[in-house]
Amino acid sequence: MKRTFQPSELKRKRIHGFRARMATKAGRQVLARRRAKGRHSLTV
């Protein structure tokens, strides 16, 4: 049985990246929340 986590940098960027977040209203809300909280890193 193979392990479930098979990392792919491309998929990671496309789903969780900055431009993906900026593309939707909800994603922009995520960024706003993380800025308000003072996160050092907003996206992956």
UniProtKB/Swiss-Prot annotation:
Keyword vocabulary terms for this entry: Ribonucleoprotein, Ribosomal protein
Keyword Ribonucleoprotein applies: yes
InterPro entries the record matches: Ribosomal_bL34, Ribosomal_bL34_CS
GO cellular component: ribonucleoprotein complex; ribosome
Residue numbers spanned by region Disordered: 24-44
Molecular function as annotated in GO: structural constituent of ribosome
Residue ranges, compositional bias (Basic residues): 31-44
PROSITE patterns: RIBOSOMAL_L34
Any single biological process term in GO: translation
Family (UniProt): Belongs to the bacterial ribosomal protein bL34 family.
Alphabetized NCBIfam families for the sequence: rpmH_bact
Protein name according to UniProt: Large ribosomal subunit protein bL34
Organism in which the protein naturally occurs: Acinetobacter baumannii (strain SDF)
Lineage: Bacteria, Pseudomonadati, Pseudomonadota, Gammaproteobacteria, Moraxellales
